[in-house]
From Swiss-Prot:
InterPro entries in the record: CLE1-4
Domain of life assignment: Eukaryota
Coiled coil: none
Protein family membership: Belongs to the CLV3/ESR signal peptide family.
Keywords (A to Z) from UniProt: Developmental protein, Differentiation, Glycoprotein, Hydroxylation, Secreted, Signal
Hydroxyproline modification, residue list: 72, 75
Chain spans, region Disordered: 55-80
Organism: Arabidopsis thaliana
Any Gene Ontology biological process: cell-cell signaling involved in cell fate commitment
Glycosylated sites: 75
Name of the protein: CLAVATA3/ESR (CLE)-related protein 4
Amino acid sequence: MASFKLWVCLILLLLEFSVHQCRPLVAEESPSDSGNIRKIMRELLKRSEELKVRSKDGQTVLGTLDSKRLSPGGPDPRHH
């Protein structure tokens, strides 16, 4: 009986491994393809410029990422 349980266990393990195969999500591209890298860099630069806002004195401050909250914030400041 123990032999039968062992075989069932091994078959279940093999079936489990055969169902879950490792595959890359994106097809690999050649490392010499610098056109895509340039495109990605341009997009990152454009998005980072969208997030920046200049103040009156010329300093760059982050516009949407600035937190206006006072620490600890919330309705009850003595909560924590």
